[in-house]
Amino acid sequence: MATEHPEPPKAELQLPPPPPPGHYGAWAAQELQAKLAEIGAPIQGNREELVERLQSYTRQTGIVLNRPVLRGEDGDKAAPPPMSAQLPGIPMPPPPLGLPPLQPPPPPPPPPPGLGLGFPMAHPPNLGPPPPLRVGEPVALSEEERLKLAQQQAALLMQQEERAKQQGDHSLKEHELLEQQKRAAVLLEQERQQEIAKMGTPVPRPPQDMGQIGVRTPLGPRVAAPVGPVGPTPTVLPMGAPVPRPRGPPPPPGDENREMDDPSVGPKIPQALEKILQLKESRQEEMNSQQEEEEMETDARSSLGQSASETEEDTVSVSKKEKNRKRRNRKKKKKPQRVRGVSSESSGDREKDSTRSRGSDSPAADVEIEYVTEEPEIYEPNFIFFKRIFEAFKLTDDVKKEKEKEPEKLDKLENSAAPKKKGFEEEHKDSDDDSSDDEQEKKPEAPKLSKKKLRRMNRFTVAELKQLVARPDVVEMHDVTAQDPKLLVHLKATRNSVPVPRHWCFKRKYLQGKRGIEKPPFELPDFIKRTGIQEMREALQEKEEQKTMKSKMREKVRPKMGKIDIDYQKLHDAFFKWQTKPKLTIHGDLYYEGKEFETRLKEKKPGDLSDELRISLGMPVGPNAHKVPPPWLIAMQRYGPPPSYPNLKIPGLNSPIPESCSFGYHAGGWGKPPVDETGKPLYGDVFGTNAAEFQTKTEEEEIDRTPWGELEPSDEESSEEEEEEESDEDKPDETGFITPADSGLITPGGFSSVPAGMETPELIELRKKKIEEAMDGSETPQLFTVLPEKRTATVGGAMMGSTHIYDMSTVMSRKGPAPELQGVEVALAPEELELDPMAMTQKYEEHVREQQAQVEKEDFSDMVAEHAAKQKQKKRKAQPQDSRGGSKKYKEFKF
């Protein structure tokens, strides 16, 4: 606990930083348990667990706990003064296994927090002094040191009171505080007397360690540097002053007191090394003294500045504090509270001092630190690509947050005249109900933008995205939420890309929507209905419903097959004659829920009335349905044809009415034809006169053939270019540079160079010419020809006779026009081409006679013999198989 001291000057109250949580290891087990009980933590467990609990409490709250004062048996006596090993500046000795200090390495880094102040390595303090390093330094504490010590004690006391208030710990009563302060004062007095008594005797450490207070760097392996102000108080550790220990492994917990009895003596240092160390220490002291003088000057300046700023801030802050106090008091009256002690004035003064000390920190609190990354100067050409990769991952959200918060900061500064304090109280602001309520009454908290809101702010709108992309018609409302909206639209616009199914963003499950659509039961296609399977199944189901349970079970054991037998001819006709193609969608046109119920406008044509529409309008359906006028005809005759379809032929309006129909307003009448005063039709040829006016009019009117309502495919241009190239090839040459093939073969005029008898006859067609024509393939040959079937009742005397005979006459007639009578097809040698036509006809007749004679001579005896031989061979092969198969008896398999 803190000790009682006269209050130091207010301007110089500066809280030292808290010590690390490692100093709890030096406490005894009883002290650890007492402190844990004080903070309301469990006290069971071994020593290491107790230390760990205290350390975790310090880390979480930021409060450094001081060593408790254990009471004696009578309850009021203070605990005995601590041993010399626990005094500040005289740390625990290390275990005997220390680093040998003979060869000094380069100055090590400052020791870790929690280690003791500088003693010779591996030299216990109870076994006499080490070789002397320096002689003759003033031992008595100066006025400045005492003043600083008193300031530290007062600051600790005030800080402890503040913490007790903020944590709502009102259980400590005022008389207990006074008793603790008295005990602390007694302890401090005893420690001072011990310190002075020891300074008179030889001390087991170099005397400069008790000298001037300052920051010292480590001087090698022998002497560790003290960090922070060295105070003479053993129980109260100044906040933030880490106590360095000599190097080496720390002693196990609970063995600190045993080290005092360790009889091992450290190794002695040679004189040459001692002189070197003394020179180093003297240089270090000079440096430290200069630094201390500079620090004193800066402290004096800052204290003057702070006192000036405090006077201005006090006037503003006092009125606010009074209001806050009144509010808090009102709330405290409502809550059940315990009666506080008498010393309210002293606590009020302390509050003022603490607020002033906090106010002095305000100029430092306003400073904002900005971290700027240093960009390396690398002139490697490949470094640019490497740098671009990292630039892609830079976060821009933080910059936007700062920009948005700038106007909010200005509002905060205007609302709060006194700047807010940062530090301990700001961390616990949320826990303090009073202060948080007051702030909520003053002003609403500035809203912090979440990542979701930031993402929404950075999104494109649908209109912006449509402007940025090449195909805006593909953009949908949810495309802006994609990670890369431009890439998504590009992928959607790519040719032959299949879209993601629409139900990806639906809440309900796929095909589970029933939004007012009456789904009809499944209907069989018409070509399957014609087989009559539907009626047969319905009849069978009715029979099964009438059956008893017994007969049903009997059928399960011995099922009867062939209940629904359809004639094979019916099935054949259904699937080969009447089958229709199912409705298929094109590539990339995915099915979505309710697609089959949508109207397909592509199938509809203006002017053609479907059967459904006719039935709904009350018009007749059938072959003579076109003779009944539509109900809108009379309105069209009055107001004109529809402007969207100017060239649509509507009977009774701009085209003649059907035959055996008449104009008039009777049932089935076609109204009145639209004519002008002179009797001429207004909109078209209503009377069917086919006058020249209407024909020329229709010719003059150019119809726009460009497609509308659907985008043209992107590959249309390429196909058009190919068609143009093909058409160019087909056109005859108009330039006149290419000579046609026929022109050189015909002699333009004059006499023939070949005599009359030597001309090639026109009647002969060579086989070569036929083959060439077939090779050219100018006409696509027919794949097959259906032969008509002839039926004969009797086979007759023919050996291979059949009732089915095919009529070949139609095929022969289709082959082409009959050859001319004079033309003869004969295979001729080149020498025989010189013969006259009479000789050739004679040769042909001889050839025909020879063929007829061969046909008459031919008989079928050889074919009959072959057939009989084959039959015998089959019988021979079948006999041994039957003999083998007779040995085994197999059950006859039935379908």
From Swiss-Prot:
Compositional bias annotation for Basic residues: 322-338
Basic and acidic residues: bias regions: 1-10, 277-286, 347-359, 400-414, 422-431, 844-869
Residues where Omega-N-methylarginine is found: R222, R245, R247, R508, R515
Positions carrying Phosphothreonine: T298, T311, T780
Record's keyword terms, sorted: Acetylation, Coiled coil, Disease variant, Host-virus interaction, Isopeptide bond, Methylation, mRNA processing, mRNA splicing, Nucleus, Phosphoprotein, Spliceosome, Ubl conjugation
Subcellular location as annotated: Nucleus; Nucleus speckle
Biased composition (Acidic residues): 712-732
Keyword check for Acetylation: yes
Numbered residues of crosslink Glycyl lysine isopeptide (Lys-Gly) (interchain with G-Cter in SUMO2): K10, K280, K400, K412, K492, K543, K770, K790, K843, K857
Coiled-coil boundaries: 140-199
Effect on the protein upon substituting K507A: Moderately diminished formation of omega-N monomethylarginine but greatly reduced formation of symmetrical dimethylarginine
PTM annotation, UniProt: Methylation at Arg-508 by PRMT9 is required for the interaction with SMN1.
Segments of this protein annotated with the region Required for interaction with PRMT9: 401-550
Entry keyword Transferase: no
Record-annotated SAP domain positions: 24-58
Modified residues (Phosphoserine): S289, S307, S309, S317, S360, S362, S431, S435, S436, S861
One GO BP annotation of this record: mRNA splicing, via spliceosome
UniProt modified residues of type N6-acetyllysine: K275
Consequence of changing R471K: Does not affect methylation by PRMT9
Subunit structure: Component of the 17S U2 SnRNP complex, a ribonucleoprotein complex that contains small nuclear RNA (snRNA) U2 and a number of specific proteins. Part of the SF3B subcomplex of the 17S U2 SnRNP complex. SF3B associates with the splicing subcomplex SF3A and a 12S RNA unit to form the U2 small nuclear ribonucleoproteins complex (U2 snRNP). Within the SF3B complex, interacts directly with SF3B4. Found in a complex with PRMT9, SF3B2 and SF3B4. Interacts (Arg-508-methylated form) with SMN1 (via Tudor domain). Interacts with RBM7. Interacts with ERCC6. Component of the minor spliceosome.
Function: Component of the 17S U2 SnRNP complex of the spliceosome, a large ribonucleoprotein complex that removes introns from transcribed pre-mRNAs. The 17S U2 SnRNP complex (1) directly participates in early spliceosome assembly and (2) mediates recognition of the intron branch site during pre-mRNA splicing by promoting the selection of the pre-mRNA branch-site adenosine, the nucleophile for the first step of splicing.
Protein name as catalogued: Splicing factor 3B subunit 2
Gene it is expressed from: SF3B2
